[in-house]
Amino acid sequence: MLDTEPVDMIPLITPEEEAEMDKEEFPSVLPILPVRNIVLFPGVVLPITVGRQKSIRLVKKFYKGDRTIGVVAQENQKSEEPSFQDIFKVGTVAKILRMFVLPDGNTTIIIQGKRRFKIEEQVQDEPFMQAKVSMLKDIHPDMSKKEVKALLQSVKESATKILKMNPEIPQDAQIAINNIESENFLTHFLSSNINAELKDKQKLLEFDDAVERATWLLQLMDKDIQMLEIKREIHTKVHTDIDQQQRDYFLRQQIKVLQDELGDFSSEQEFERLKEKALTKKWSDKVRAHFDKEMSKLQRVNPMAPDYPVTFNYLELLVDLPWGENSTDNFDLVRAKEILDEDHFGLTKVKQRILEYLAVLKLKNNMKAPILCLYGPPGVGKTSLGKSIAKALDRKYIRMSLGGVHDESEIRGHRKTYIGAMPGKIIQGIKRSETSNPVFILDEIDKISKDFRGDPSSALLEVLDPEQNSSFMDNFLEVEYDLSKVLFIATSNALDTIQPALRDRMEIIEINGYTLEEKIQIAKKYLIPKQKEEHGLKAKDISFTDAAIVKIIEDYTRESGVRNLERKIGAVVRNIAVAIAMETAYTKKIQPAQVREILGSEDFEKDTYQQDDLAGIVTGLAWTPYGGEILTIESIISKGKGKLTLSGQLGDVMKESASAALSLLRANVDAIGIDHRVFDHFDLHVHVPAGATPKDGPSAGIALYTSLASTFTQRKIKPALAMTGEITLRGKVLPVGGIKEKILAAKRAGIKEIILSKKNKKDIEEIHPPDIADLKFHFVETADEVLAIALLKQKIKKPFNLEVPEEPKKKDK
């Protein structure tokens, strides 16, 4: 049971009585009475109602004796049966002046504080608490000091100010303060009656120095004055607000009447509209209960309150979202294939996968949508393919660009508690589509970044997991939403920058760059008609020859896709549009000569194979983000001491390939026919031209090995031959990537034969046969097979002299 708060009592003691209290002797073992919310100070008289059985036994026993007890404040306010661990260690010796037993069984005592003490040791806990204590002495200040006088005067002034500001304090208190003669008792009296927290009052009691106690008391009183001033301001503002609210009420009533007259929507009409839309939604019981709860909350909120628009917008989102409202898929596979072929040339793998999905969906209507990732170089039609897929399926199309997204809230949304909160881009996109099964393009998923605000790619893990996205939780939405019917298609230029866990959730479909023949067909079927239409030209106004298209592709673009090709075609079409608009003569059939006249000098120099009667010149093949290229590797020797020099801005992997090739060559000197001494008497320099362009990767391994073998044997290299493959110290030839792009680059450069690893044969089978009809392939497993094909028996016309002079024999002494 709680001990009650002290009632207002204004006792006065004289300095003489205070001096007698300081001299009074008290027993070293005292019964301890724990009290709540009360700190008793020496000299102060307080009434206390005692309700605990332990406390009642203690009071009744010692009231019959010398009436001396120890009063200690309870530190743990929640404890109903406090122990020594639940009370403070400093308390006040008290004399029980009076005791009253009330009809309800409670006992009220009037006590007066005498001396401060500190609990040293626990003596007993039953039938009441007893402890061994030591008395604490007060350090009294020199009252003649100006600082002490000023401090006490400030305390009195603050007390007077509180009395004037707080109407609940009796006016007699001011008279009592004025009549207190003892400065020490004045601080005790004010400390007991100040409006402060229990821990602050206990701190006042524990001070030994009276000056420190008065200083801390003054700080608490100043804080109390500040609180009273704030209360007064609030009280004044409340009265003003009530008047304003009454005025607003009458104005709103007038506005309501005017709205009814004009036919405008009122809040009640908005509520009815939301409820009517809610009845049409296919919600689960949980979502419907959540809507009803938020709706009930909105109806209780003042329309002028800041929370009103947030809650209203939230409810609008709930009723505007499509919940299980799927568009009807068109299961005509022939039509779907025609649409995909009509909009995009090639891309066989992707088209086949979409047709498979549509076929399975036709057989099993509740199939979860796949998560596809179209991976390939820029400009090959990854993003635009999404539109064609949506068109083929008769679904809505939504696109979200992830490039530069660095805030997790862009995916999951913000919580409603934040100002300007809104749902994430996923939920926003679903709302715009008005269906639960759109085609959703996540563009540039490899370009997501992260910072201190979170990792968006981690947030996408839930979105792109077919096992989890049926219960996607948006922070703003606060209820689960089913994304399992959404056909997510991500696009990416690279895979290494995508988080591994995210990459694992997607079905990766690689889209390679277009061949020259494919680009010609794309230009004729798609790009040229599109540019004519965009620039207002008719079909008969202009036509391109195949040679003109090839000229644009080879001399003015260098890319795997067709973006720049479209720009250059657009430039030619615009030039013709100017001629038509100005009614000047022009050539309707565009030839290569007209292309150069309109576009100017060639932007790129075409890679062509150049045959040289030199040793060590080998044609390798390289892959770039813009397609394949031929890579010339040169090596030369000069007299020296076996120094190896590598140049051409080679990366670490390519340098290691050169070192491995040289080591393998030195290990096979006998089989190849090289004098092992040449490695110590000649310096070797390997160079890869286009020194400003960084080059790296292991695919030049066999080309480097062939170049070194030709240099140290001075034998010719087979003409019109190119090669690509990684080499090992055991002489094995390993497969490499980018085969399609490399093969097409070799064909454009005039290469006739190509050496590849035997394990790359499967890559050749995926290339359209007409594209490689004029090429001969050699599939090898070892470096010896490479040299057998690449090195001719005859030497070059002017071979370098590799003879090493015999060292003179040392004579025996």
UniProtKB/Swiss-Prot annotation:
Q: Where does ATP bind?
A: G376, P377, P378, G379, V380, G381, K382, T383
Where located?
Cytoplasm
Induction, per UniProt: By heat shock.
Domain Lon proteolytic, first and last residues per copy: 612-793
Quick one: a GO biological-process term for this protein? cellular response to heat
- A GO MF label: ATP-dependent peptidase activity
Transmembrane stretches in the record are none
Q: What is its main location?
A: cytoplasm
Enumerate the UniProt keywords alphabetically: ATP-binding, Cytoplasm, Hydrolase, Nucleotide-binding, Protease, Serine protease, Stress response
Q: What is its EC number?
A: 3.4.21.53
- PANTHER family noted in UniProt: ATP DEPENDENT LON PROTEASE FAMILY MEMBER
**NCBIfam families attached here?**
lon (TIGR00763)
Protein name, UniProt field: Lon protease
Origin organism is Cytophaga hutchinsonii (strain ATCC 33406 / DSM 1761 / CIP 103989 / NBRC 15051 / NCIMB 9469 / D465)
Annotated gene: lon
